[in-house]
């Protein structure tokens, strides 16, 4: 069976996001194995910084690519006209269609990402709290991606 260009774009976007989803999980396992806590976070060694940088990069890429590539590609494959939709409208439409559990939760995940990547508090405990929030958000992103995977394979 031949795929439409929209279906091919959707498959490409899904594969891209899946590639980003694996790397944060790997770095998170390594971070947990190292036992990085608030005290250690204030004085990270070179290897720990690399792990956190890898996590931060892949986490932000996953969030960005899901929002800018996978979600629009999903809507296009469903026959929706995304050109006239704002990002918030796309999230709301995906929620209506049952592809996204909550547009508001997605917005919260975006806010966590923005705080993690753009705000640099001086206090190490605040930075560590933002890392913890990003770790939890990464797990939620993986769950959202799994929801999209199940819908795409239907």
Regions found by a protein language model. Name each.
Residues 1-154:
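Solvent-exposed interaction patches of small proteins and small membrane subunits
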């Amino acid at each position: 069976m031949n795929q439409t260009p929209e279906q091919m774009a959707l498959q490409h976007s899904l594969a891209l996001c899946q590639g980003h989803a694996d790397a944060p999980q790997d770095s998170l396992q390594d971070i947990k194995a190292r036992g990085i806590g608030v005290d250690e976070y204030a004085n990270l060694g070179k290897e720990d910084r690399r792990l956190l940088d890898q996590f931060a990069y892949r986490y932000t890429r996953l969030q960005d690519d899901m929002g800018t590539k996978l979600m629009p590609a999903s809507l296009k494959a469903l026959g929706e006209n995304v050109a006239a939709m704002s990002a918030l409208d796309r999230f709301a439409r995906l929620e209506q269609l049952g592809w996204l559990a909550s547009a508001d939760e997605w917005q919260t995940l975006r806010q966590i990402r923005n705080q993690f990547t753009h705000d640099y508090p001086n206090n190490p405990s605040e930075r560590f709290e933002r890392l913890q929030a990003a770790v939890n958000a990464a797990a939620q992103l993986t769950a959202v991606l799994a929801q999209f995977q199940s819908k795409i394979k239907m």
